[in-house]
Structure formats: C-alpha cells, structure tokens
C-alpha cells in the first residue's frame, strides 16, 4: 500500500476494477426493490461544467447508497443532442452539426467516466440517433391520428436577411443575433399538440392543496410555477356587437368582438377595446388607413413571446372603428395595441383604465377616458396616478354602474354574467394561460416531421413502415435558411397515396419533444420493435403502495426546467398512457432541483466602454476595516481591451453569480480532477451546501476537501501495519462482536462512530449529503483521537469504525473508499464494496457505561463529572459534591440545593 495518497493511481485502480467487472450494468430483477434515479440529460456542448459535476454526484451518491441497502438501482445517461447550438457551431466552423455533436459526446463521456459515476452505459442514448427519433415520429403520427396533433398557422420571428426563422432567444433587442436585421413577425403553418386537452389533469396532479394532487414529492416552488403557467382563470367571455362589414358586405366575425375578462365587475368602466395587429378588425381598418397599416407592420418587429411583450412599451393606434357596449349601448372605440397577442384568447381585450394598471398607463398616454366603477372605502381616486387599490377586487364595491352598483366582486360578476347571458352575448367561462404546444421548427438539426406534401393529396403522413425519416448527416448550414429545403435527396419523394412526385416536410420538431420521454427509452434502449416495453413497465411501474407515487423514483435537475421540460414530459407521459403504452399517470415521483454553482465576478470597463471580465485566479480582494469586500485588484497581469494590464490594476467586484463562460468565472472540472482527483471534486460539491441550495465556490475549501481525503488515506496506511485478520473476522460476523471485550476507550469510540452513523443514515435518506460528509469528518476525528492498544477489543473497534467510515464515504468518494477497502482486507471478509451491505447501527454500541455531566456552581459552568450510566440522583449528587471542581468554585460555602437535569448537567447552588 502506497504511503502517500496519489489520486491518479487510486482512481486508475478503481476504474480498472469496475470496468473489469462491468460494475454498473443493471438488469430487471424482480427479487429486489427497484429504484430509478435519473439526472436530466445534458446537451453535448463540449465540456462538463461544475453544475454537471454537482448534479451527477448527487445522483451517484443516491445510487450507490441504495445499492448497498439492497435496491436494484438504475442510473442511466444520454445526450439531448439536437438543437440550435450545433447549427451555430456548424455555421462558425464549417462542419456538419452531426460531427460537432458526436465529437462533444465522446469528450463529455470521458469526463463523466473520470468522475467515477455509476452509470449503466449500456443504456446510453443520443436523441439525434435515428433509432431514437424514429419513435418521436411514430408517436407524432399516433397523435395525428387521435387528433392530438394538428396543423395551423403560427406567428414566428423572421430574419429577412438570412431568410430564416429565429428562436426567441436569438432575437436581441428586436434584431437577429447574426445579421443584426430588424426581426419581423410572420404567420406560417406549423404543427401543434393539444396539451390544452390535458390542462385540468396537469393542474390537478401538481396543484398544492388539491385533493387529486400526486406530485407531493416535488418542491412547492416548482409546483406553484407550473400551476401559474397552466394558469386556470374563471371569468366571463362576452361580445361587443358591431355592424362593421368587409368588402363583400358581410359582418366581420358575425358582428361580434369577443373578449375574456376575470373582472366582469368592471365592465361598466370600459372606455376602449384593443385588438392584436393580426385581428380581422385591425386588418380591415388598415386596408384603408396607411398610417395604421404602417403601425401594424412596425408591430411585427421584435419577438413573439408573452414575456417580451410585457417588457415592451405599450403602444397603440385608433382604427376609427367602434363597437357597442353590450350593457349600456354606448359606442366604444377600437384600438390596435402592440401588447395584445392574437394567440391568446380572442386576440382582443377590453380597456378599463380605472382598474387595470396597463390600461391606466395606456389611457394616460393617449388621453383616453378613465371611468371609475369600483370604490374601496376610505380611498380617494386620483386620475393622474395609479394606486394599487384601483385593482383590488377583494375590498372593492361597484359604483357608477347603474343597476350593478353597490355589489361586491363576486356578486357583481354573477350579476353581469347573468345579464350578458340573457342578451345572448356572454357566459361564464374557464380559460387557461396554457397554449397548445407548437412543435414545428424551421431548423435543420432536429427530428424531421414525418409528413409528405402532395399537390393532389395534401399533407400525407409517412407510412409507419417507412420510419424513421432520416435526417441527412452531412449538411452544413450557411445561414441562408433551412438546409433541408435545398437538399433534393431529402426533399423529393413519391406520395405514398397516389405515387405522384411530392416533397417532404422540411420543418423539424422542437427539441423539447426529444426530452419529453427519453427517461422511458433508457428502460428499453435497444428495442427496435417498440417505443417502450417490459423494461419500462419494470422501472416506471406504479409504486403507490410503497412510495406514494408512480413512475421514476427520483429526478434531478435545475429549476430552470421547472416549467417547459417538466410540463411537456408530464403531458407526453399522459398521452402515452392514453395510447396504452405506459401504466403511469406521472413520470417523476420525486424531484430535486439542485442549486446553482456560483463564483465571484470581476470586471472592468475599457476606454471604449466595453466590459472585460477577469478570471478569479488573477484577482485579489480589497477589504475595509470590518473585513468587508469593497473592491478588487489584479494580482497577475491580465489581457484586456486596453492591452495588458499590470499587477495592482483596480478591478470592479460584482459579487457572486452563476458560473459562466462569458464572465470568466467558471471552474473547469477537468483541471480540478487532474490537480486534486475526482473524489475531491465530488466531495467538495457535496460538502459545501445542501443539494437544493446554491453553492458558492471557494478554492480554499477545495484544498480542505483534498486534505481530508489525505487524512483518510494516512489513517488507512497506519491501519495496514497492524494484524487485522482476527478483527476483520469479528467484524464480518456481527453476532460475534457481542463476545468481544471492549475497554473503556474502545467503547467510547464505538459510541461515537455508531451515534454518527445513526445520523448519517438519516441524512442519506433525506439526501442531505453535506451533513453526511460532516459525519464522515467526525468519524475520522474520533478514529485519529483513539488511543489504540494491543487489546483485541481496541483493534476490533478500529477495524469496525474505519470500515463504517469507508462505507459512509463510498457513495461520495468511491475511488479512495474502494482502494482502501481492498488494500485493508475488508473485501475478503465483507465482499466487494460495490455491493457491501450498508453498515447497521449496533444497539449495544449506543449503551454507555458512564455518562459525562456538566457541572455548574450557581448556574455557571465550572467543569464536568463522570458517573455510571445507571447512577441514581443520590449517586450523582454525591459525585458532584465530591468533585474537585465543586470544591474549587464553592470556596468553602455549603450547598443549599442540587438541581439535576438527567443526562445533561448538575447545578449546585451554594
């Protein structure tokens, strides 16, 4: 056994053993309780970052600890391999996205293997593999057949220079990220999935306080985010009648402008209506109004998301059209508003400036009437400044509302809804913020949508026997539109219905499709005949009786995926259930959203106003007298936009933030592993903070983790020098420990080890891995402090204690634990550490012969006494009064009273 800890040699030996034994291959074993633990699959961007290291180590600790406890545990891995970054890299480097993607996968896989993760690589998938995305296409066709998938027009971001559609994240300040051209909005056809058909069930299962909720193992924050995204709203949908006619003399939209509101109590305060730029009334008015037409064109610039529109300045223009208020008969002016989305509701909203903050600002800007119709007792309305109470529906009472005056919110809504229904112009209605999922992307690197367009037959599904529709692997995007549209070999095909020449659909699927079911494919990764089968039934089976949930037992990933990915995966699972493919309602029983990894951020403005960022290792902090960081300066020369900056140059300190390439505050896991070893990287990311909280990087703490592992190794070296055979035999047969004569010190060591083990076991169950590591540190402290003797009992206590420590540490630092376990002979008696039984707390070790009680004199701590564990009050009092500490601090005074707190302290009042 080497005297000094060499992480490179230790990790090489551990990997050789695991590889030789195919240690992590898992099969379905009905004799064991199953546990499926999965991290969200990564995008193969090129290198792992510390967030990956933290996520996968959490998963690995769970996997290894449960395997030791007798579970059949699956920890798979794959690659979310389609997507825009590969196209961007191809555009930049002139290589096909496939080549860039697979090169990155190979490198990142090596990094994961270096971490020592217990991944079953036989189940590895890549979503860009035709054997995988074939089933995206297959299920899409099933959805099409069931009416869940359908085709309609959609508004997209269009770059007029590149002649291509841009994702929302590619639109920067209203311009295309590559060309800088002003982005336009265009309506183009695309395929949608009816996620709204599942809105109620999606809400029921996630909603806090709902009796139908099943996702009680999810963080409340995520559940609330999903509930808000689904956005169930109860209100009134009603119409403003009109007589606006098109060129053919027909009333537009049957003479009714529909809106939806949750504030029907304010209907008497309507002073305008606003419609989306694409609304039929807006288009009709623009046909004879050049200024309005120009405004509508201007509205097409910029992004299409609700979030982006919320941040834009609200602008509008009158159409010159009027509709009729359904209850008062007054004429209401129609405006075009850049903040109204055609895809939400009916593409129109009622304007009630007095009681809606957005409408209030709009009315002030364009000098529109403001009519107060709700009053909160004791408040005064100011027509020049918004006050929060204007929108308060809980305390408000209607005023200036004719027959509807003097009503509470609930009563007013009911009365207004009844009046509108009697006129045939409205009804109570539930609406959802959730919209059908548009999956068409005008991109190359994605799953081809299996549709053929024929002039005679229309849009024809690709026959199942012809799946997959394989994406060409060798195309290189040039920035001028979708390469598939120019690839004749892909594009040209005969119609499967009539046999005439036709063309393939060139849109590809949203990459969220790929990640909506991959966790099921891990269960049957090589099945060429079915999307899912027996493996999925086993790993995703209903475990309600045992765990209170169903599906995957534990899912781990970032909270940034709280809405889209997790919501789409839930929807996809429910569709697969309804198609008879799976038997579960929800995909993930428990969810852990691990915290971000943060680091210090340092920057400096250049002479031209640009911002340079500097690596933390080139910077040192400047502190004030109280020790607070007040600035920073360079401790090494560093390049900047102003040239090479010398040591001592002042630098701006921005605090801590998420590790980022753009801010030069990331830490390369590869460099960390090479310098300190994978075990140190793993240990540090687990010890520094609880898994669900953010982790603030600290180089000194990394060094501390490495020193701790050296201490463990050094203790193992000391232990290797003693004769351990008899002690190992005793430890291997737990029953025989009862026959071992433990001395006072050995009993104290066992008490400490087993007390800590009891807490560590609980912490493992809670996935509080930071306190698991703290417990391991307490164990090594106790072992190092133990004054070993040649007695058999002392050696057994040492061997038992260190064996427990190695098993406690193994899930966190498997390499060093494995090598020490082997070198010290534990494997020969207790078996390979891979499947060694989890250590059990020994009840006899927790039984104390003696107790240490704190001694107080007149309430002040003055020392301690030791008494027999069975000592009664009289014996404890006698020991206290006889102690040196009492006589020293009593100063000859007689005791008046002795107060005993059992198991803790004795207070003598003199």
Swiss-Prot record:
Annotated residues for binding of ATP: 661
GO molecular function: aminoacyl-tRNA deacylase activity; ATP binding; leucine-tRNA ligase activity
Entry GO terms, CC: cytosol
Residue window of motif 'KMSKS' region: 658-662
Extent of motif 'HIGH' region: 42-52
Pfam families in UniProt: Anticodon_1 (PF08264), tRNA-synt_1 (PF00133), tRNA-synt_1_2 (PF13603)
Top-level taxon of the source organism: Bacteria
Documented EC number(s): 6.1.1.4
Subcellular location: Cytoplasm
Transmembrane spans: none
Record GO biological process: leucyl-tRNA aminoacylation
SUPFAM superfamilies in UniProt: Anticodon-binding domain of a subclass of class I aminoacyl-tRNA synthetases, Nucleotidylyl transferase, ValRS/IleRS/LeuRS editing domain
Annotated catalysed reactions: tRNA(Leu) + L-leucine + ATP = L-leucyl-tRNA(Leu) + AMP + diphosphate
InterPro entries: aa-tRNA-synth_I_CS (IPR001412), aa-tRNA-synth_Ia (IPR002300), Leu-tRNA-ligase (IPR002302), Leu_tRNA-synth_edit (IPR025709), M/V/L/I-tRNA-synth_anticd-bd (IPR013155), Rossmann-like_a/b/a_fold (IPR014729), tRNAsynth_Ia_anticodon-bd (IPR009080), Val/Leu/Ile-tRNA-synth_edit (IPR009008)
Keywords: Aminoacyl-tRNA synthetase, ATP-binding, Cytoplasm, Ligase, Nucleotide-binding, Protein biosynthesis
Top-level EC class as recorded in UniProt: ligase
Chief location of this protein within or outside the cell: cytoplasm
Residue pairs linked by disulfide bridges in the UniProt entry: none
Family, similarity comment: Belongs to the class-I aminoacyl-tRNA synthetase family.
Protein's name in the database: Leucine--tRNA ligase
UniProt organism field: Acidovorax sp. (strain JS42)
Gene: leuS
């Amino acid at each position: 056994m080497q005297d000094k800890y060499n992480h490179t040699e230790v990790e090489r030996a551990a990997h050789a053993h695991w590889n030789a034994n195919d240690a992590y291959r898992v099969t379905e074993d009905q004799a064991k309780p199953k546990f499926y633990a999965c991290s969200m699959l990564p995008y193969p961007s090129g290198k792992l970052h510390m967030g990956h290291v933290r996520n996968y180590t959490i998963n690995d600790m769970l996997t290894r600890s449960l395997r030791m406890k007798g579970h059949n545990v699956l920890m798979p891995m794959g690659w979310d391999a389609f997507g825009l970054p590969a196209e961007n890299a191809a555009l930049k480097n002139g290589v096909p996205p496939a080549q860039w993607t697979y090169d990155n996968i190979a490198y990142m896989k090596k990094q994961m293997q270096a971490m020592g993760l217990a991944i079953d690589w036989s189940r590895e998938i890549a979503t860009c593999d035709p054997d995988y995305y074939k089933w995206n296409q297959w299920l899409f066709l099933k959805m099409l057949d069931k009416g869940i998938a359908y085709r309609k027009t959609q508004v997209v971001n269009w770059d007029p220079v590149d002649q291509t559609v841009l994702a929302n994240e590619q639109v920067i300040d209203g311009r295309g990220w590559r060309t800088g051209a002003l982005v336009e909005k265009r309506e183009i056809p695309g395929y949608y999935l009816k996620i709204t058909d599942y809105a109620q069930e999606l809400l029921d299962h996630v909603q806090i306080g709902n009796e139908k909720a099943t996702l009680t193992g999810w963080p409340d924050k995520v559940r609330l985010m999903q509930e808000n995204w689904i956005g169930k709203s109860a209100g009134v949908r009603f119409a403003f009648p009109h007589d606006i006619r098109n060129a053919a003399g027909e009333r537009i939209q049957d003479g009714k402008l529909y809106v939806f509101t949750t504030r029907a109590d304010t209907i008497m305060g309507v002073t305008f209506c606003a419609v989306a730029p694409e609304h039929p009334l807006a288009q009709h008015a623009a046909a004879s109004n050049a200024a309005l037409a120009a405004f509508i064109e201007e509205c097409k610039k910029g992004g299409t998301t609700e979030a982006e529109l919320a941040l834009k300045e609200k602008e509008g223009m009158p159409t010159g059209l009027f509709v009729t208020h359904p209850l008062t008969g007054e004429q209401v002016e129609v405006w075009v508003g850049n903040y109204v989305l055609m895809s939400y509701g009916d593409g129109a909203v009622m304007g009630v400036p007095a009681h809606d903050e957005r409408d209030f600002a709009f009315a002030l800007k364009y000098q529109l009437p403001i009519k107060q119709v709700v009053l909160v007792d004791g408040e005064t309305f100011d027509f020049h400044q918004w006050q929060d109470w204007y929108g308060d529906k809980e305390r408000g009472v209607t005023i200036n509302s004719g027959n509807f005056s003097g009503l509470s919110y609930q009563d007013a809504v009911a009365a207004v809804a009844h009046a509108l229904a009697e006129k045939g112009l409205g009804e109570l209605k539930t609406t959802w913020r959730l919209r059908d999922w548009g999956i068409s992307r005008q991109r190359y690197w994605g799953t081809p949508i299996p549709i053929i367009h024929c002039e005679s037959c229309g849009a024809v599904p690709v026959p199942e026997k012809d799946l997959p529709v394989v994406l060409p692997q060798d195309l290189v995007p040039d920035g001028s539109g979708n390469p598939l549209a120019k690839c004749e070999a892909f594009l040209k095909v005969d119609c499967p219905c009539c046999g005439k020449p036709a063309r393939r659909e060139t849109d590809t699927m949203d990459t969220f499709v790929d990640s909506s079911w991959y966790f099921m494919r891990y269960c049957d990764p090589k099945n060429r005949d079915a999307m899912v089968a027996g493996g999925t039934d086993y790993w995703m089976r209903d475990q309600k009786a045992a765990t209170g949930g169903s599906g995957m037992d534990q899912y781990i990933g970032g909270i940034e995926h709280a809405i889209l990915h997790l919501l789409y995966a839930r929807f996809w699972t429910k569709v697969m259930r309804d198609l008879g493919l799976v038997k579960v309602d929800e995909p993930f029983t428990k969810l852990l959203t691990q915290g971000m990894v943060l680091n210090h951020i340092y920057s400096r403005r250049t002479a031209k106003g640009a911002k340079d960022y500097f690596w933390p290792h080139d910077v040192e902090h400047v502190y004030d007298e109280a020790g607070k960081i007040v600035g920073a300066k360079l401790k090494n020369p560093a390049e900047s936009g102003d040239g090479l900056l010398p040591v001592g140059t002042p630098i701006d300190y921005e605090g801590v933030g998420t590790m980022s390439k753009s801010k030069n505050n990331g830490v390369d896991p590869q460099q960390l592993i090479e310098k300190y070893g994978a075990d140190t990287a793993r240990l540090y990311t687990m010890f520094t903070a609880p898994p669900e909280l953010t982790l603030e990087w600290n180089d000194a703490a990394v060094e501390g983790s490495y020193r701790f592992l050296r201490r463990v190794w050094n203790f193992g070296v000391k232990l290797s020098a003693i004769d351990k055979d008899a002690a190992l035999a005793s430890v291997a047969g737990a029953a025989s420990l009862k026959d071992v004569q433990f001395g006072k010190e050995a009993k104290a060591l066992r008490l400490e080890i087993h007390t800590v083990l009891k807490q560590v076991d609980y912490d493992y169950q809670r996935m509080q891995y930071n306190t698991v590591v703290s417990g391991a540190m307490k164990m090594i402290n106790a072992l190092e402090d133990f004054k070993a003797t040649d007695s058999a009992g002392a050696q057994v206590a040492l061997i038992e204690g260190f064996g427990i420590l190695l098993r406690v540490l193994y899930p966190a630092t498997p390499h060093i634990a494995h090598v020490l376990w082997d070198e010290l002979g534990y494997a020969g008696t207790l078996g390979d550490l891979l499947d060694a039984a989890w250590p059990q707390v020994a009840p006899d070790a927790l039984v104390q012969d003696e107790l240490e009680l704190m001694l107080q004199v007149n309430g002040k701590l003055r020392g301690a006494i030791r008494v027999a564990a069975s000592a009664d009050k009289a014996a404890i009092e006698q020991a206290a009064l006889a102690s040196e500490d009492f006589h020293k601090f009593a100063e000859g005074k007689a005791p008046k009273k002795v107060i005993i707190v059992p198991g803790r302290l004795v207070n003598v009042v003199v």
